[in-house]
Amino acid sequence: MISLKIYFVLIFLFLKGINSAYVSNEEGETVDFTFSGFYANLTYPNEISELNYVEGNYLSTRIVRFNGSFYCDTTILSETNNVTGSCYVANCANDTVLEICDSGKEVHFTDMSGTTWSADTFTENLYWFCGGDGNKPNMTTAAAMNSDIDSYYVYGNWTIDTADSTVADYTCNYTHFQEAGDIEKGDVYTASADSSDSSSASSTIFKPSYFISCLLSVGLYLVLNF
């Protein structure tokens, strides 16, 4: 009789392979995850799961695999500051912006180098959100890094200015790195940051495929051996 350990490993690898092939071969498949970072002068929940509505602020990111390229869809939502649905979409493969839509408020971003971009000028420089090879992307090296996208790296350190004297400005700092090969359809990414340090964050990945593989492995083992 096949050993229990070997049996589980074989079933797991088989199901994992099916899931990975399905994700990588389908155009337009999406993986949704949520990042919860530290906002310097606002109160918000430290950890957010999935894309559920919560009081406070959060940043959600979607990765889409399409024709071998990665498109980063980053949306900044702020219930407190009433900057709702500000949407910026970049093509990480060739560093061009696909589209941009904002909520109607004037929003300014300050990037890692300290350069400030308005919503209008930022459309031409959005690709610094995206990077490859595990390097921190920036305005000048993003094109070279994205020539070989084998990982997804997002690094943010900017200030959002609502251009409204009645609404407080705030700064968002976050860092996220994830190997592209580890991202699968249905994954739920959650991250939390210590409010005492806006640059630190911890993250966990829950993979439904792993859980299902485990259940099926146990079920098949019980059926065949008892």
Curated annotation (Swiss-Prot):
Q: Which UniProt keywords apply?
A: Cell membrane, Glycoprotein, GPI-anchor, Lipoprotein, Membrane, Signal, Vacuole
Query: This protein's superkingdom?
Result: Eukaryota
> Membrane topology per the record?
Lipid-anchor; GPI-anchor
* Signal peptide boundaries: 1-20
Q: Where in the cell is it found?
A: Cell membrane; Vacuole membrane
- Expression induction: Induced in iron-deplete conditions (at protein level). Repressed in iron-replete conditions by transcriptional repressor fep1.
Q: Which residues form the propeptide?
A: 200-226
Q: What is the effect of changing C87A?
A: Decreases heme binding and cellular heme import, and abolishes plasma membrane to vacuole localization in presence of heme
* The keyword Repressor belongs to this UniProt entry's keyword annotation: no
Name any one GO molecular function. heme receptor activity
Q: Where is the lipid attached (GPI-anchor amidated serine)?
A: S199
Q: Which GO terms describe its biological process?
A: cellular response to iron ion starvation; heme import into cell; heme transport
Q: Which GO terms describe its cellular component?
A: external side of plasma membrane; fungal-type vacuole; plasma membrane; vacuolar membrane
Null allele outcome, as annotated, is:
Impairs heme import into cell; simultaneous disruption of str3 exacerbates the effect.
Chain residue ranges for the region called Heme binding: 72-101
Described by its record, this protein's role is as follows: High affinity heme transporter involved in the assimilation of exogenous heme during conditions of low cellular iron.
The name under which this protein is listed is: High affinity heme transporter
Organism listed in the record:
Schizosaccharomyces pombe (strain 972 / ATCC 24843)
